[in-house]
């Protein structure tokens, strides 16, 4: 046996497909919920529910999410995940990327970190993008909702506060009306004249929260360069 001391070593090396399967139970109160399979970190995957293919994902450095809503009803189901650290990863990445090389983390196989089935309301905040505008101390906020039906009359609230600065600042919250049939929105949210600016010596950050009252909320961090 050859001993290796210049990088990580393993008892066994494997490249190819690995299969993981287990029975899951969906509770009755998840009926009509939006259900997502969340895999925090893995290799290229294919997912099946009860033998029906849900989809594929090849993310290596970010979480993978699969929408299982139309595959799961309350009751028993079989979840199967195929993870492939072989030819599903391009050869150049396998041979030279820090995500795969023996001198860093190796070309491991499997699923690590959080592995969850997440159930949420059919209406939720799918994404939020924030673009600080230094000139008028505002933030352009782009929001995408999960769907556009059943939202008429509901409101979305934006709020923001500095959280890592000696000088505290909390912007005045603002409410916006949601329109039936619209799932994408763009707002200009004012932080106020006393908003704290980001610099390399004082990297002031804000937590910007978007909330649909009693339904869902999402928070992102932003900074406004001086």
Question: Which residues make up each language-model segment?
Answer:
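Short, exposed coil/turn segments at beta-strand boundaries within extracellular/luminal domains
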Residues: 168, 214-217
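Accessory beta-strand-rich segments of carbohydrate-active enzymes
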Residues: 10-125, 148-149, 169, 220-222
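Beta-strand-rich binding/interaction modules
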Residues: 47-49, 138-177, 183-187, 208
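Surface beta-strand/loop "capping" patches
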Residues: 119-150
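Extracellular Ig-like/FN3 beta-sandwich strand-entry sites
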Residues: 74-76, 153-155, 182, 201-205
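Conserved small/polar residues in nucleotide/adenosyl-binding loops
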Residues: 225-226
